[in-house]
């Protein structure tokens, strides 16, 4: 059987909403990632079979197949095809899994895959009139997050709960307290700050050159969202963000963010031929559907399905990255799967680092891969790692990798 390996994985810093990366177009962010991956591996770009990039919005500068735009902007040959994948929050991971399966099936030898999102630059949109020129008011939607142009039939059958309400639904169903959510959020920030200070992200984060108002340019090379000054007391004083007596707040939720991330995948045979040392083997992936109103539980059936496919158990997994859309959602997944919290998001998660939708799936896998590599010198190095995300409208996706080298 063909072996799929990951040779390199990188990401930009994750920018805050309206922060330093807000000045950079998403297609330029993605182009930087692709260009850097090729340069770091020193491969002939004509060897690349195809490029897959995830993106959740696609309503603004990321429209009309951003993967293709980024490929050309990266200076890569126009002969390389590219396609944009949309599974909302899991788009970046889906892109990687599609590429891995293509290699496994013998469709190609080398792929670039990942994801990008600029929530800061997401536009407002409103519908065209159905009959002639409109009079009166129009409803405009902020495309950075949530439903837009919801189908009335969809709403009547499944509801169109905002993402925060879906987290409230899980908090109620799994009896997750406000205190537990705030403690989890605090720990996410503290772990992320500790990882930044220790330089754990240095090998995965590439700097982004950002133009300034004075005409100069600066390099942005660090995640913007982690808060050094946060405390459980401060988090506990925040008001519920979605319902009056709720427990989900802005402090125990992920942010709206900007960023890009991608990996270089190839067959094991091609890696040997090019004298490239893989950092991990792609073991497998799985997706699953859940009720949209509890979309955050999606990683549970996706992970269970994947463990069955790979003949593994949660006891075999040494490190886990769960996208922290909300503390309530992540705690529900941990509880339902019976996971050891000590191996989950060891360097913080999206509550601290940020959640740049289409980028996040690739981002959590990139962080997982580099942490597994860093721990290779430990007395008991990790073997298997799991990356998983919940997905709006009720899905989950999971991927397992095996450390190499």
Residue map of PLM features:
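N-terminal extracellular/periplasmic Venus flytrap/periplasmic-binding protein-like
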Residues: 11-12, 22-27, 31-32, 40, ...
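Flexible glycine-/small-residue-enriched beta->alpha junction loops
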Residues: 110-169
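Active-site pocket-lining segment
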Residues: 166-168, 201-204, 283-352
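Condensing-enzyme catalytic core mediating Claisen C-C bond formation in acyl metabolism
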Residues: 1-24, 36, 145, 150-152, ...
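Short, well-ordered amphipathic alpha-helical segments that serve as non-catalytic structural scaffolds
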Residues: 26-42, 66-70, 95-98, 163-170, ...
